[in-house]
Amino acid sequence: MVAEGDPGNLVRTIHLLVLSASWGMQCWTTFVAGFVLIRGVPRHTFGLVQSKLFPFYNHIVLCCSFISLAIYAAYHPRELLSPSESVQITLFFVCLLAAALHARWFSPVTTKTMFKMHIIEREHSLGQGVGLSANREAYQRLQEKDPKYKALRQRFMRYHGISSLCNLLCLLCNGANLVYMALLMPTL
């Protein structure tokens, strides 16, 4: 007979710490770090810093997503899931899937494409301006006169957009799971 187990205080604490640490890191990276950095350093420096930090960030989110799903699934047998528990385990799974796609496919392609763009931009003395609006006209002219750069830019924007959506999806799933957990807490 399938039975729902009591995870005990240690497992519950680990689960809450992993989920909240992941969500906090996602909030910081998504809403603070990138915006502060892009306004403070040259564009190519920003890309280089992102290329070094994001693989760690993406894989930490992936590991935290796996741990959260594994702990939750271990103590909530499929046969005994309530509708709200079904939603919660689905959110954990969606987060894991989005984190895996982000870490293993979309983010690496975005980074490789960005570095190819940097090579062309350096040839045209671009990339040292601070902020997204620096030399906007020069980037536009480069796109118009260089079809290879234009294609790279389109590829970069497509993969960067999908990568950002995966990140936001994980952020929303983890946030919703934290809300579910908070609503189930008997007291503070």
Swiss-Prot record:
Compartments, record wording: Membrane
Keyword list, A-Z: Membrane, Transmembrane, Transmembrane helix
InterPro entries in UniProt: TMEM205, TMEM205-like
Keyword Transmembrane helix: yes
Keyword Transmembrane helix: yes
Membrane topology: Multi-pass membrane protein
GO CC annotations on file: membrane
Transmembrane segments: 18-38, 53-73, 89-109, 168-188
Domain of life where this protein originates: Eukaryota
Sequence similarity: Belongs to the TMEM205 family.
Protein name: Transmembrane protein 205
Organism, as annotated: Xenopus tropicalis (Western clawed frog)
